[in-house]
Structure formats: structure tokens, C-alpha cells
């Protein structure tokens, strides 16, 4: 897995829609993604799944070098989908059930994304899921 995620472009959309699962997603979350892509893929030029942002935790210097790299990689925050439409980014968080925690999570990702990409457009934020409750929506 590359540090910058799994990139799919407009040329990959047909293949992407036919997938049973998506990188680093559960079967249920993959179903949510598939339904969203079927309805919205024409709005975007690209999708990057599992885009890592943030610094991660400091690794133990006594561990093997590979373990240290994995510690940093695994502890960085993961934007489920970074979608692009020209230069405009959209951060997409995928949940089976959308909760207030999901909304806070995407705000954290926005902050980290802006910190790492200060020249980027202000990202649109989207949280997708199968269901939620009236207080969250």
C-alpha cells in the first residue's frame, strides 16, 4: 500500500463500480460506497481511497526499522475517500451508521488535510452511510 492511498481515475470508474469491496473497507461499508459512487461518480475526476493525513505517533526507537515505519503509518489518520473534481477536493467519510462521532471525525480530517495542503481549495465534506438518527442529520 502506498502512503498516498489507492488512486482511481475517471478511466477506472466502470471497474470501480463493479467491485465487491473497496480498499481497507468492510463489506458493509463497501456497499455504502458502491451505492454512493453509482449515484455520484460523474461529479468527480478521481477517487483516492485511504488517504493518510497527520503525523501519527512517535515510534519506539528500540523497535526494528520496519516496525517503526508501520507504527507511524498505521497511526496516521485515514480519510476514507479523497475525491477530486479538477482542483477541488472532497473528503468522504464512510460509515454504516452516521453518528455525531462521524461528523467530528471528518472535521478532524479537514483540519489535517488543510494543514498538509495549505494551497488547496477548501474541501467539501461528505459523510455517507446507510442510516442515522434525526438528531445527527
State where each predicted segment sits.
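Charged, terminal alpha-helix-loop-beta segments
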Residues: 1-137
Amino acid at each position: 500500500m502506498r502512503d498516498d492511498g489507492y488512486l482511481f481515475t475517471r478511466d477506472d470508474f466502470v471497474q470501480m463500480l463493479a467491485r465487491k469491496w473497496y480498499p481497507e473497507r468492510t463489506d458493509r461499508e463497501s456497499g455504502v460506497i458502491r451505492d454512493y459512487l453509482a449515484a455520484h461518480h460523474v461529479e468527480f475526476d478521481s477517487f483516492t481511497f485511504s488517504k493518510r493525513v497527520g503525523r501519527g505517533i512517535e515510534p519506539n526507537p528500540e523497535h526494528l526499522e520496519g516496525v517503526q515505519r508501520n507504527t507511524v503509518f498505521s497511526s496516521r489518520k485515514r480519510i476514507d475517500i479523497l475525491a477530486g473534481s479538477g482542483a477541488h477536493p472532497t473528503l468522504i467519510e464512510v460509515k454504516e451508521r452516521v453518528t455525531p462521532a462521524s461528523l467530528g471525525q471528518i472535521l478532524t480530517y479537514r483540519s489535517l488535510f488543510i494543514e498538509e495542503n495549505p494551497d488547496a481549495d477548501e474541501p467539501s465534506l461528505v459523510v455517507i452511510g446507510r442510516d442515522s438518527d434525526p438528531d445527527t442529520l
